[in-house]
């Protein structure tokens, strides 16, 4: 069985402090060339898309262009997600031809660093060049219901570089070949992640046996997720987690530095998680707090009411 996506955290450090992004409590770390080579060998032939983050800003890693080239040569389709503030140091990426680059434009309003026009000029120069070389570029405004006052100005600045008409899509617009603008709601992280939640609890989550606590009412909910079937996550210390939302390593199933992927996926805890979702049950407290896993809700698409 081919897993669709693997999120490899090449660094867990970020240069911004966005209000919508949870804060992890792990030691700062980035992958070495040898570690990245080992991890990609472990999932080679078993994963289609390789994402270069789980937490952290991938453009901070000095070996990112080399990593993208290594991954492409091993047969992966490479995907980068960035806040777009460091694109001036990422021009070498244009020659590595990533499959897709996603830029989170909503990070600017959350941090208010520098002029929006300067930020967007950098974003659009890079994006149009990358799209021209064949990389799929996605400009994301995932802030509906949150800090979205700059959205209209962002769209006006985009139009300076890519004039209308734009082709409307269910989630936004196709601006031109290989360049898209995408809208969505403010993301809700599981486990009470995010700045507001961590401020209220001084960075500590309610615990039960070392894991996130869950409300008794959660047991009445129905859950479904394709974690471990369609996606996996790998933290910068090699820990394998079920999905891209386990930002703090609450559900560590094994370590790819020391174990094979098959061994980890065959473990009792991993099997229980997969089997639970087959019966619309969530065995892990983190999953019980995840909006994306609720059967009666859909994260993408319509606005939350």
Enumerate the predicted regions with their spans.
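N-terminal pre-core extensions flanking Radical SAM catalytic domains
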Residues: 1-27, 41, 202-203, 209, ...
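Short, functionally important structural connectors and interaction interfaces within domains
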Residues: 6, 23, 47, 51, ...
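Radical SAM enzyme [4Fe-4S]-AdoMet core and its adjacent flexible, acidic
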Residues: 31, 74-77, 93-264, 272, ...
């Amino acid at each position: 069985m081919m897993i669709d996506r693997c999120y490899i955290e090449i660094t867990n450090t970020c240069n911004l402090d966005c209000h919508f992004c949870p804060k992890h409590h792990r030691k700062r770390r980035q992958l070495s060339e040898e570690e990245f080579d080992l991890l990609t060998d472990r999932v080679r032939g078993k994963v289609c898309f390789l994402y270069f983050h789980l937490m952290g800003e991938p453009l901070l890693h000095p070996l990112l262009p080399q990593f993208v080239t290594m991954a492409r040569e091993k047969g992966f389709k490479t995907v980068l997600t960035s806040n777009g503030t460091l694109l001036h140091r990422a021009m070498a990426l244009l020659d590595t031809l990533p499959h897709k680059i996603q830029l989170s434009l909503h990070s600017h309003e959350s941090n208010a660093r520098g002029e929006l026009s300067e930020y967007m000029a950098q974003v659009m120069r890079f994006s149009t060049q990358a799209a021209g070389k064949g990389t799929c570029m996605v400009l994301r405004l995932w802030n509906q219901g949150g800090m979205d006052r700059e959205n209209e100005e962002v769209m006006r600045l985009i139009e300076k570089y890519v004039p209308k008409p734009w082709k409307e899509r269910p989630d936004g617009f196709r601006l031109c070949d290989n360049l898209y603008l995408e809208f969505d709601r403010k993301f809700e992280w599981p486990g009470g992640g995010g700045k507001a939640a961590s401020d209220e609890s001084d960075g500590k989550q309610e615990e039960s046996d070392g894991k996130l606590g869950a409300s008794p009412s959660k047991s009445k909910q129905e859950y479904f997720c394709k974690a471990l079937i369609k996606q996996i996550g790998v933290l910068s210390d090699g820990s394998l987690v079920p999905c891209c939302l386990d930002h703090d390593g609450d559900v560590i199933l094994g370590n790819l530095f020391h174990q094979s992927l098959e061994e980890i996926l065959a473990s009792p805890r991993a099997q229980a998680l997969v089997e639970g979702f087959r019966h619309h049950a969530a065995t892990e407290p983190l999953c019980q707090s995840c909006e994306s896993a609720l059967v009666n809700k859909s994260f993408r698409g319509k606005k939350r009411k």
